[in-house]
Design a protein with these regions (language model features):
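Generic C-terminus detector
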Residues: 372-376, 381-433
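Active-site "cap" helix and flanking loop/linker of ATP-utilizing ligase/carboxylase catalytic domains
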Residues: 249-271, 288-362, 375
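Internal nucleotide-binding/catalytic subdomain
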Residues: 155-296
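Short acidic-hydrophobic, aromatic-tinged amphipathic segments that line or gate anion-handling sites
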Residues: 46-52, 123-127, 159
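A conserved helix-loop-beta module that forms one wall/lid of the active-site cleft
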Residues: 92-155
Length: 433
């Protein structure tokens, strides 16, 4: 019987999840809360804050949803999956205890240390003075300072000198830029090498990695400017060879799942591994307890299997018997952002070039809505820092990148900002073999 599904969140990632779920024959009525303007073309939207666990769970119970996909990190960390389970509604995503793998950097670093999972050397602190004493004593730059808790993907500072480190410590620990997330910090060594994002499905027993991807975090071309939630992605990541994939499975993926089980908090859902391929081998930079944004916008378009079946298998512990297959092709996503993002930007700018939220007549192009709204007169307008993600799929990455940019040119709004070099590093790596 077709399932009535609720997706919790309201960005490009959630839009990509909804579009993939809708391909499943078991997917019936689909809702998104809070959703956004562009998502409302694909799902019914209900304006409930993703972090309002009580209201969301009451809504899910009242509407009798068969399955809930909790796609955003904050509600997972707040225990939304536990609260849904308490009223008998199955959900995709880790419970509160397992979500700590992302919600607390201290927890995840200590987990890796205890179970021998390769990661950067680190120390944890709750006293700002001691942080600076340690950094001065080490005398090694750049140094990485991370807020312990969730910080919208912006709680990681790479400091080139003592002054930057002191400013960073003040910002996180004293000025409380990220609130209680900055009560503790992790200080770690700066690693070098290509970065790889690997999202994986897990039921707490087996891990089935998705196709690898490459994110572009900085706001401007040539990886300059401020860190953002991500300005574009490509998949697969050419640096992630079959040999490296096998090494990661043996030394990182399975050991992480076993470690969580040993700690009494088995992880079910999407576990995202942020990896760096260092001269000493792959190391974990970060874990996320959910799909990445905008990685999801290139990974799920390449999924050939039934996403709803895979998700329910993760929830039910039957992933070993469930097919997870990706196409051999490639995908590229270019983010169209509001000028001034990630600092100050205006909202409410009319968007032109789209029909019902999509580019008309483009077979292999999908527009995912991150921050859009529909006004009372039906105009699609900007409503966030990252506005749209334009994804192209093609047999080869070169074509995917070219087509994503060609499609992006057809969309416009005032003060639109995009990077012009998404995928160039990956294409260079392919060219160099």
């Amino acid at each position: 019987m077709a399932k009535k599904i609720l997706v919790v969140g309201g960005g490009g990632r959630e839009h990509a999840i909804i579009k993939a779920l809708k391909k499943s024959p078991d997917c019936g009525e689909i809702w998104c809360a809070p959703g956004n303007g562009g998502i409302s073309y694909d799902a019914k939207c209900k304006n409930i804050k993703a972090t309002d666990v009580d209201t969301m769970v009451a809504f899910a119970a009242e509407e009798q949803f068969d399955y809930v996909v909790v796609a955003q990190d904050d509600p997972l960390a707040l225990g939304m999956v536990d609260a849904l389970a308490a009223v008998g509604i199955p959900a995709f995503g880790p419970d509160k205890a397992a979500a700590r793998i992302e919600a607390s950097k201290v927890f995840s670093k200590d987990l890796m240390k205890k179970y021998g999972i390769p990661t950067a050397r680190y120390e944890t602190f709750d006293d700002p003075a001691k942080v600076m004493d340690y950094i001065r004593a080490e005398g090694r730059y750049p140094v990485v300072i991370k807020a312990d808790g969730l910080a919208l993907g912006k709680g990681v500072l790479i400091c080139e000198n003592e002054q930057q480190a002191a400013d960073g410590v003040k910002e996180i620990m004293l000025d409380k830029k990220f609130g209680a997330s900055g009560n503790h910090v992790v200080v770690e060594e700066f690693l070098t090498g290509p970065e790889v994002s690997v999202l994986s499905f897990t039921d707490g027993k087996v891990v089935k990695p998705m196709v690898s991807s490459m994110d572009h975090k900085r706001a401007n071309d040539h990886d300059t400017g401020l860190n953002t939630g991500g300005m574009g992605t490509v998949a697969p990541n050419p640096y992630y060879t079959p040999a490296i994939a096998a090494e990661c499975m043996e030394k990182i993926f399975l050991p992480t799942i076993r470690a969580m089980n040993a700690e009494g908090c088995p992880f079910k859902g999407c576990l995202y591994f942020g990896l760096m391929l260092t001269p000493d081998g792959p190391k974990v930079i970060e874990y996320n307890c959910r799909f990445g944004d905008p990685e999801t916008q290139v990974v799920l378009p390449l999924l050939e299997s039934d996403l709803l079946q895979i998700m329910t298998a993760c929830t039910n512990g039957t992933l070993a018997d469930t097919e997870v297959r990706f196409s051999e092709g490639a995908a590229a996503c270019v983010i169209l952002a509001s000028g001034g993002y990630p600092v100050q930007y205006e909202k409410g700018k009319p968007i032109s070039g789209l029909t019902n939220g999509q580019l008309a007549g483009e077979e292999n192009i999908t527009v995912y809505h991150s921050g859009t709204a529909i006004t009372e007169d039906g105009t699609l307008v900007t409503n966030g820092g990252r506005v749209l993600g334009v994804t192209a799929t093609a047999p080869r990455l070169t074509a995917a990148v070219t087509q994503a940019y060609a499609a992006a040119e057809k969309i416009s709004f005032e003060k639109l900002h995009k990077r012009t070099d998404i995928g160039l590093r990956a294409l260079k790596a392919i060219a160099e073999g």
